[in-house]
Amino acid sequence: MKQKVVVGLSGGVDSSVACYLLLQQGYEVEGLFMRNWDSATNNDILGNTNINDDICPQEQDYLDAKAVADKLNIKLHRVDFIKEYWDYVFSYFIEEYKKARTPNPDILCNKYIKFDKFLNYAINQLNADYIAMGHYAKVEFNKTTKQYELIKASDINKDQTYFLSQLNQNQLSKTLFPLANLTKEQVRKIALEQNLITANKKDSTGICFIGERNFTSFLQNYIPSQTGDIVDIKTNKVLGKHIGIMYYTIGQRKGINLSGMSEPYYVADKDVKKNILYVCSTSDQSYLYSTSCLVNDINWILDISKYVDDVNQFECQAKFRYRQLDNKVVVKKIDDNNYKVMFKKPLKAITIGQQAVFYLDDICLGGAVIDKVIK
């Protein structure tokens, strides 16, 4: 009897090709399209360029997913997780921005929606043995450690293990990643060869399941903005006014709107209580560098005691944003939920609220939220 795989069929090229490959491998395949955002229900008006369109991008995605399912002769189911997305992902996203932190909704979306709500629905309602996604990542079972390992994809430029760092053993044991050993070019080539409607569709960008938005306007739907001073961190001189401290991220250069300056300025720090945005000039970029950070809400994907000699302090690599090169670090345990991450060399623009993701070579160990940056 064939094993059944339910694929998160999003209407994009990656999940389309994932379906095709699983069929080629002999699985029984069905698609499941998720709708996780409703602009009307969620007051998504400001910054939404699609608000007056006859057909919203999500509905077009569903039509594309349906066309792919029809072409491959598989069933396509549809499910709404609009409330769950709001409760588990978007509420946290907004609360973090209120604190002038910079969260990563894609990581939460994977943890709570794609690999939790979706996974449970596929197994309990559709009788799936596995789920599959169009992510670029690998899962392998290590017979020595008896752990499911999340491993970087063959195409390092597309590797998405950073966004999967909050997953657990149970989720990995039920997940297939058919694109693990393919490049994006190979995926598009397969889609073209199979005449899939999504072959030349551009990759989705913007906020997970919400899409492209004018970000400043979008946040104004949910958080009142308050102007304040822009201050040179070196001289303490007021240089101008910011439009709301939450709209800026550490290391940002564009959009600060300081006119008449002899050189570009970068966002260096934020004082939430005083509503001050601190900036530094290009010649004072040392203010952007830090030597370590504190992280919390740690998630170890696997039993790290089987991978490092001392779980209280060990060397590994880390990424502090997507597509960043791996950095050598020492991870020191403070308590079960708090760790200090010490950098082998100072790193630029480490941002509170973002995710620190830890690796041993190509194996993703897990991730944690950056809570404090130490200069």
Curated annotation (Swiss-Prot):
The record marks H135, Q354 as: Interaction with tRNA. Disulfide bonds join C109-C208. Keywords: ATP-binding, Cytoplasm, Disulfide bond, Nucleotide-binding, RNA-binding, Transferase, tRNA processing, tRNA-binding. Residues 158-160, 321-322 are annotated as: Interaction with tRNA. Signal peptide: none annotated. The keyword Cytoplasm applies. It is found in: Cytoplasm. HAMAP family: tRNA_thiouridyl_MnmA. This is tRNA-specific 2-thiouridylase MnmA. It comes from Mycoplasma capricolum subsp. capricolum (strain California kid / ATCC 27343 / NCTC 10154). The gene is mnmA.
